C-alpha cells in the first residue's frame, strides 16, 4: 500500500497474517482505555471535531481552549492522506468517493498529490520573503535541471500552500 517497492527478508515474512484482527484488537484496547478514563475523578471535558483546520469551527467559542493537540503534515512526497482515507473506509466512516475527496481537500497540502486547482493557501504568505524565496529557489533549480514532470513543476507550490495553510490554521486556532 505505497508507491515504493520494498522487500523484507523472506524468513521474516508472515504468511496469511490476520492484520485486520490485530488492528481491531488495538482499537478495542484504546476504547477500553477511554472507558477506564471515564471512571477517574477530576477529568476535564474534551471535544474532538472533524473540520478543515483552516476554518475555525463556529461551535467552538473564542478563548475556550486550554490546549490544542494537532499533528500537522510535513512537506514531503509521502501522501499521509492515504492512511487517513484507508482507515476511514475500513471503519465505514465513508462510503462514497466524494466523501474521501472532501476529506483530502480539507487537509493542509503537504505533497504534490494534495494540490487542487482552486487552492489559495499560498496567497496568505506571499508577503513572507523567508518562505517565498525558498519556493522560488526550488522552482529555479527545477528549471536549471530541466525537470519537466507534472509533479516536479508543483514542488515549489507545495512549499507555498503548506506554509500558507499552516499560517491560516494557527491564526484560526489563536482566536
Regions found by a protein language model. Name each.
Residues 91, 163-175:
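A short glycine-rich, Lys/Arg-flanked "PGG" loop and its adjoining helix->strand segment in the class I
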Residues 54-58, 158, 171-173:
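Generic recognition of flexible, low-complexity loop/linker segments
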Residues 141-155:
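Short glycine/proline-rich turn/loop motifs
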Residues 153-164:
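Acceptor-substrate binding/catalytic loop of class I
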Residues 1-138:
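Nucleic-acid modification enzymes, centered on SAM-dependent nucleic-acid methyltransferases
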Amino acid at each position: 500500500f505505497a508507491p515504493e517497492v520494498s522487500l523484507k527478508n523472506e524468513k521474516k515474512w508472515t504468511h496469511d497474517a490476520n492484520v485486520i484482527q490485530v488492528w481491531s484488537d488495538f482499537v478495542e484496547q484504546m476504547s477500553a482505555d477511554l472507558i477506564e478514563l471515564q471512571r477517574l475523578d477530576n477529568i476535564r471535558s474534551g471535544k474532538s471535531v472533524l473540520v478543515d483546520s483552516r476554518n475555525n469551527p463556529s461551535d467552538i467559542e473564542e478563548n475556550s481552549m486550554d490546549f490544542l493537540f494537532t499533528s500537522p503534515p510535513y512537506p514531503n512526497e509521502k501522501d499521509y492522506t492515504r492512511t487517513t482515507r484507508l482507515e476511514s473506509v475500513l471503519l465505514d466512516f465513508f462510503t462514497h468517493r466524494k466523501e474521501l475527496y472532501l476529506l483530502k481537500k480539507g487537509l493542509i497540502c503537504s505533497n504534490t498529490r494534495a494540490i487542487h486547482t482552486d487552492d489559495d493557501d499560498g496567497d496568505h504568505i506571499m508577503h513572507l520573503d523567508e518562505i517565498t524565496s525558498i519556493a522560488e529557489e526550488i522552482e529555479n533549480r527545477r528549471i536549471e535541471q530541466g525537470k519537466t514532470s507534472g509533479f516536479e513543476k508543483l514542488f515549489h507550490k507545495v512549499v507555498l500552500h503548506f506554509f500558507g495553510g499552516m499560517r491560516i490554521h494557527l491564526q484560526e486556532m489563536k482566536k
